[in-house]
From Swiss-Prot:
Coiled coil: none annotated. Residues 1-40 have a biased composition (Basic and acidic residues). The keyword Transcription regulation applies. This is Transcriptional regulator YqjI. Keywords: DNA-binding, Repressor, Transcription, Transcription regulation. Divalent metals such as nickel and iron have a similar negative effect on YqjI DNA-binding activity. Residues 1-46 are annotated as: Disordered.
Length: 207
């Protein structure tokens, strides 16, 4: 069953048309920019704040799985899902309604969730049997997504440390200066690579 859902659309939130997506959303969701993208990106800081490199939290199909996993614990509403994802990423990424609701529409079209209107205009979102089955078929991927998000959140916290930021900025500046020299030789490049590899290894050996 998973091949039908995972392969029917190239982008999160895009409805299926004759077996594929005919359109591509032109919006992108980056930190500090009022654009939207279904994959969800952040800058190591809270969505809506500028600065830092963009970092993608969710790849193709991953936001759908995260939403289904949240719904497997309890029924929800759109704004609650947004908050749950924000909590999952420790505030580093907050999906906009323009990302969440098209994705929910897609999941409903695939019979993975139901959306029922309640009194007051709220819409209750619930997981279907098909949705639960697809989620279980992809449980290993869900766990990998969660582990990757935890690691990225730790990295974002480290980058907020002033000394860590200074050290990283210094490293990037020196590397950029040396590598972009017009007269740099192959031997010098190999030495730089060896230094980077050695530093990476030394970091892995720290207690």
């Amino acid at each position: 069953m998973s091949h039908h859902h995972e392969g029917c659309c190239k982008h999160e939130g895009q409805p299926r048309h004759e077996g594929c997506c005919k359109g591509e959303k032109s919006e992108h969701e980056h930190c500090g920019h009022g654009h939207q993208h279904e994959h969800g990106q952040c800058c190591g800081g809270r969505h809506g704040r500028g600065g830092g490199r963009r970092q993608r939290f969710f790849g193709h199909g991953e936001l759908r799985l995260v939403i289904l996993d949240i719904l497997s614990r309890d029924d929800s509403h759109g704004y609650e899902l947004i908050k749950a994802i924000e909590n999952l990423t420790q505030g580093n990424y907050t999906p906009s309604p323009g990302v969440i609701y098209p994705t929910l529409d897609f999941l409903q079209e695939q019979s993975l969730i139901t959306i029922r209107e309640e009194e007051g205009g709220k819409k209750q979102i619930a997981l279907t049997e098909q949705g639960a089955q697809w989620l279980e078929e992809n449980r290993e991927q869900v766990e990998m997504i969660e582990e990757r998000i935890k690691a990225r959140c730790v990295g974002a916290a480290l980058r907020q440390n002033p000394q860590m930021k200074r050290a990283l900025d210094n490293f990037k500046a020196v590397l950029d200066l040396r590598v972009n020299q017009s007269d740099i030789s192959d031997a010098q490049i190999k030495k730089i690579i060896a230094v980077i590899d050695r530093a990476a290894f030394d970091i892995t050996q720290l207690d």
